[in-house]
Amino acid sequence: MGKQCFVTGRKASTGNHRSHALNANKRRWNANLQKVRILVDGKPKKVWVSARALKSGKVTRV
């Protein structure tokens, strides 16, 4: 599985970096993902979770 939030599905988004001459280069905006242990089906598992999901209390650490 890729680097994506286990709870919200947030992942990196793409776009362009623009110089002063308006040249376009591809770039990525990475989500703030943290690897944490949570209970999945009653068992502890290490998954990627976004910091926003952790702060809002959507998951609890084990």
Curated annotation (Swiss-Prot):
SUPFAM superfamilies: L28p-like
GO terms under biological process: translation
A GO molecular-function annotation: structural constituent of ribosome
UniProt protein name: Large ribosomal subunit protein bL28
Stored Gene3D superfamilies: Ribosomal protein L28/L24
Organism in which the protein naturally occurs: Staphylococcus epidermidis (strain ATCC 35984 / DSM 28319 / BCRC 17069 / CCUG 31568 / BM 3577 / RP62A)
Family: Belongs to the bacterial ribosomal protein bL28 family.
Gene that encodes the chain: rpmB
Classification lineage: Bacteria, Bacillati, Bacillota, Bacilli, Bacillales
UniProt keyword terms in alphabetical order: Ribonucleoprotein, Ribosomal protein
N-terminal signal peptide: none
GO cellular component terms, semicolon-separated: ribonucleoprotein complex; ribosome
